[in-house]
Amino acid sequence: MTGEDFKIKSGLAQMLKGGVIMDVVTPEQAKIAEKSGACAVMALESIPADMRKSGKVCRMSDPKMIKDIMNSVSIPVMAKVRIGHFVEAQIIEALEVDYIDESEVLTPADWTHHIEKDKFKVPFVCGAKDLGEALRRINEGAAMIRTKGEAGTGDVSEAVKHIRRITEEIKACQQLKSEDDIAKVAEEMRVPVSLLKDVLEKGKLPVVNFAAGGVATPADAALLMQLGCDGVFVGSGIFKSSNPVRLATAVVEATTHFDNPSKLLEVSSDLGELMGGVSIESISHASNGVRLSEIGW
């Protein structure tokens, strides 16, 4: 997290505030997302729900596929790279995407190091499930944070847990009385004292913080906005439903009018069959289940 480059990159991410970012796997889906009012799309070859089932190593998408989506819409396009895989990031940056997501949804390439994002011109998005994780990613140069949630499940509870935890930890740290106490917490979080102080003074992260992971309905999106998120990522929920066009528009409307119950009632009606999903509690380590939110450090 350094100087003017970071200000520019975090400023670009600020432009997405209040919006919805949708996962898409084809140019046709990207066009649906754009028409529905999405502020950006995430181009990837498989949505998280399908990645969960495959059991395969998940890598960055084919650059040609990403380029085809970039050529199909006028809104910003994001693409995912594996945690720690700075060469995938170099390739995606050369493709001139608008944002890169260093994502726990893909199979990590490095189990001890995240990408040094300050070395790139393109803004990075990273997931976090608590304040320390968010600040470590920001210190590496992330211009945007999202809750990890539990991607591909349609179960919003992990995303709710993560945004509540970050908010509560900021409030708790604001109660610290001495410089020594603040320094101790910063050391425990493995971040500079100056970064933690900046958060405590502002009462929020220095970058936008979107909700992600398990968002499947307009009500889910509005819930996370009311809990303090700056916007919403929607992955598997849209195109695993029976009426993606209607649902995509409804989620955008709910994100915009998140504090208007009458509008939320209107956009939540007659949506067709929603994503079936998988409950968080059914993903057990005993049965070799993998919780994607636990990937990262």
From Swiss-Prot:
Knocked-out gene: effects: Defects cause some sensibility to 6-azauracil, an inhibitor of purine and pyrimidine biosynthetic enzymes, and methylene blue, a producer of singlet oxygen. These effects are probably due to the inability to synthesize pyridoxal 5'-phosphate.
Gene3D superfamilies the UniProt entry points to: Aldolase class I
Catalytic residues (UniProt): 80 (schiff-base intermediate with d-ribose 5-phosphate)
One biological process term in Gene Ontology: glutamine catabolic process
Catalytic reaction list: aldehydo-D-ribose 5-phosphate + D-glyceraldehyde 3-phosphate + L-glutamine = pyridoxal 5'-phosphate + L-glutamate + phosphate + 3 H2O + H(+)
Broadest EC class assigned to this enzyme: lyase
InterPro entries associated with the record: Aldolase_TIM, PdxS/SNZ, PdxS/SNZ_N, RibuloseP-bd_barrel
GO cellular component: glutaminase complex
Alphabetic keyword roster: Lyase, Pyridoxal phosphate, Schiff base
UniProt xrefs under PROSITE patterns: PDXS_SNZ_1, PDXS_SNZ_2
CDD domains, sorted: pdxS
Binding site for D-glyceraldehyde 3-phosphate: 164
Function: Catalyzes the formation of pyridoxal 5'-phosphate from ribose 5-phosphate (RBP), glyceraldehyde 3-phosphate (G3P) and ammonia. The ammonia is provided by a SNO isoform. Can also use ribulose 5-phosphate and dihydroxyacetone phosphate as substrates, resulting from enzyme-catalyzed isomerization of RBP and G3P, respectively.
Record-stated family: Belongs to the PdxS/SNZ family.
Protein name (record): Pyridoxal 5'-phosphate synthase subunit SNZ1
